């Protein structure tokens, strides 16, 4: 399922294909004692089953996992280190993440990052994006991005819960315009804008969800006339554009 700028989200069949691909490769890597494919699997699961933004995934620490704090959720932190929200996850994913820590991050401290680059440093956005793009190509589904996996998570969560406010909380959307973005994603998935969900307190009169976009690197709102789409197809805010030009 794509638009002119690339894939917007995955169909159910495409999601199964991607998850099956990374799981098969990860299981083989575990047998061989290698880590790259296991990291790839963790990345795809955190994007597709938790809906993390790229910067949230890169900043995830071992102390944010259920095995550390005891809640069946991931703690997503803000820029000050405080817990911005708690995203519920399945027991299966919690166990997979715990096994990853036991097998590949043994001895790491709670404040250490969950996922590192292949050189042992912090995992950066472009490295994450390139990994996801490569996985999409190798799984033979074409263009794939962190944003497409996040949108897939949002629409699946809404279809499962039918609770717009809950989806807003889990996805980390705070503004009324962001609520409109969720509505757009969920209604696009249903293929019928006439069936726009109207939950109490979420009236969207006068809000055009197409007036703003979300930076696919940091999650910031991009207003009309700012940001741009880079060569890779990702939409970035002016702040991230300045950062990547310096890098």
Residue ranges and their predicted role:
Residues 1-214:
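Conserved catalytic core of the tyrosine transesterase superfamily
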Residues 221-224, 243:
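Cys/His-rich metal-chelating microdomains
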Residues 230-244:
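Cysteine-rich micro-motifs
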